[in-house]
Each structure stands twice: as structure tokens, then as C-alpha cells.
């Protein structure tokens, strides 16, 4: 059985609050495609694997991304330069960056973190989340 990595050897992550400004609404699966294509166009496949963008939460028009700390600037520049998706104009604005999801939700998205915390606690009681 594999041992887990100690915290000092794990990849450092940052959480990015973003907002999509567009005429149309996008479902969560399409937002994943938008973020991936923005990073792929600007950074390429190797850069996308290094940035490692992961969509944590999305409720139109804002969401939360998890990215690698070292490549945060690449993500910022690729999202700023992305201006068109499926021939529709689109603008992705970064609201803020933090090292915790709780801080992102409360400070930048103005959403209480407590409902999410209660769901996680219920799942832990059922032994579904470690």
C-alpha cells in the first residue's frame, strides 16, 4: 500500500475566484472546457499540465479554480487573453486569489462557507470522506 506524501512534499495550491462576463450562461461542464481551452491556447499541453486548473465550484457567473502555486501567473495571463468561445465574445475576470476555499467564498464571492462545511461533516460521519 502506498503511503501519503507529507505536507512538505505536496504540491502547493492556490484557489482563484473568477467571473465569466458573457451574453449567455454556461453550464459547469462547458466552463471546464472554456478554462482548459484558454490555458491550452496560451500555454500548450505542457503548460496546461503544469498549471493544472481544476474547477472546484461554479455558479453563474462566478466560480472557484484550484491551480498550482508556481504557475498562477500563467493562468492569469491565459484567462485575460481569452476573448472568444464558440464565436461568442467572452471575458474572464479574476476576482481574487487565496490559499483556502473558505477565504475565497467569504471574502471574494460573499457566500457563507457554513453550508458547505455542514455537508462535509455529514459525509465524514457516514465515512464517505476522509
From Swiss-Prot:
Subcellular localization(s) per the UniProt record: Cytoplasm
Top-level taxon in the UniProt lineage: Archaea
GO MF term (any one): ribonuclease P activity
EC number: 3.1.26.5
Keywords, sorted A to Z: Cytoplasm, Endonuclease, Hydrolase, Nuclease, tRNA processing
Catalytic activity: Endonucleolytic cleavage of RNA, removing 5'-extranucleotides from tRNA precursor
Pfam families the record matches: RNase_P_Rpp14 (PF01900)
Gene3D superfamilies: Ribonuclease P, Pop5 subunit
Function: Part of ribonuclease P, a protein complex that generates mature tRNA molecules by cleaving their 5'-ends.
Matching HAMAP family: RNase_P_2
Protein name (Swiss-Prot/TrEMBL): Ribonuclease P protein component 2
Amino acid at each position: 500500500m502506498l503511503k501519503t506524501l507529507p505536507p512538505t512534499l505536496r504540491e502547493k495550491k492556490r484557489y482563484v475566484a473568477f467571473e465569466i462576463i458573457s451574453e449567455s450562461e454556461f453550464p459547469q461542464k462547458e466552463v471546464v472546457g472554456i478554462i482548459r481551452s484558454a490555458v491550452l491556447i496560451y500555454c500548450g499541453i505542457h503548460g496546461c499540465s503544469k498549471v493544472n486548473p481544476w474547477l472546484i465550484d461554479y455558479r453563474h457567473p462566478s466560480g472557484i479554480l484550484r491551480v498550482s502555486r508556481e504557475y498562477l501567473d500563467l493562468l492569469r495571463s491565459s484567462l485575460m487573453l481569452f476573448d472568444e468561445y464558440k464565436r461568442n465574445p467572452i471575458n474572464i475576470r479574476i476576482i481574487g486569489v487565496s490559499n483556502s476555499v473558505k477565504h475565497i467564498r467569504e471574502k471574494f464571492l460573499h457566500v457563507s462557507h457554513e453550508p458547505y462545511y455542514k455537508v462535509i461533516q455529514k459525509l465524514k460521519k457516514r465515512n464517505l470522506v476522509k
